[in-house]
Structures are given as C-alpha cells and as structure tokens.
Amino acid sequence: MKLTKILLGALLLGGFTACNDIEQADRYEPIEVTAKKNVLIEDFTGQHCVNCPKAADEIQRMQADSTIGEHVIAVSIHGGSMSKHDSETSGLGLATDEGETYNSRWNVKSWPKGLVDRTGGLQDYESWNASVVSRLAETPKVNITADKVAYDEETRTLKLVTSVSGNADVTG
C-alpha cells in the first residue's frame, strides 16, 4: 500500500514536470478573415433592457476590430416590452412603430437579441462575432456598388444610383 502511494506520488510529480509552459499569446491562433462582403447586425434592444449595453459594447468592439470592423453594419431596433415610447418619456423614447413591427415579425421575447445577415435566426450577442466572421468569409452572389448618393435634408429624400454585378448564376 505504501509502495502504491509512493509510485502514485512519483507519477503525479513527473506529470507536473512534463507540462509545457505555453505563453498566453501563443495559445490562440487567430483565423485570418478576408472580407468579401459587408454584414448587417440587427440589434433588438430597449431602454429598459439591463443587458443591452453589453450587446452595444460587442458591436462597438467588432466595429473597432482592424480585420472586420469596416465590414460590420449595425442597426439598433427599439421595440417590444423593453422599449420606451415618446408618450411614456416626454419625447425621449426611442421605440418606433417600425421597431414594434420588426420585434413582432421576428417574435423577439427576450433582449438583447440580434439577427446577423438574417441567417440563423435570433441570436444572443455572445454569438454575433462568430456569425459575422463566418458570413464575411462567404462570397456574395452579387456585388452592389453605390455609385452616386444624394440626400436632401429638407425633404428627407435619398437618391441612390447603384450598379450590380453577379458573382454566381442565380435561378428563380
């Protein structure tokens, strides 16, 4: 019995000395992403939502990322029970009728949630980065370029001239 304890102790001691000491920077190998498109994140949020600032921070972090940032487009949509309307807040509410329609359409029941390029359904903000990286690696079926953009502030009219070129055959 004593010999077993000694052997077990020696094995454990030997096991600890066999461990490699890997520096923190060497433990993670980032995957290079060559963005071929832009990705839209629709962030369902609300002024009563206590975790929604974390989702906003995640979007800000992605947009600050030198590899993917310029390809991440985010839209915050206020609607549902976590949002405030102007009538509730003396004109300071951010909820809109359109936001309510989007929340209803996507059946948002908890916040924050988001859609990444409207694929994969509603996601928690912790999943957005992986979804964005995955979508950025895809080749878009078409390239859309805004050739001329003109916005008239007085009439709130946007005029946009675009050109579209195909990258793949599309049927249907």
Where do the PLM segments sit?
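Structural recognition of the beta-strand scaffold that forms the well-ordered cores
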Residues: 40-43, 73-78, 112-117
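Thiol-based oxidoreductase modules, predominantly thioredoxin-like and allied folds used
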Residues: 68-97
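Conserved redox-active cysteine motifs that mediate thiol-disulfide chemistry
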Residues: 44-58
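Sec-exported extracytoplasmic/periplasmic mature domains
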Residues: 54, 60-68, 119
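Non-globular targeting/processing and membrane-anchoring segments
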Residues: 18-31, 133-172
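Extracytoplasmic/secreted envelope proteins and their assembly/folding machinery
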Residues: 56-60, 99, 129
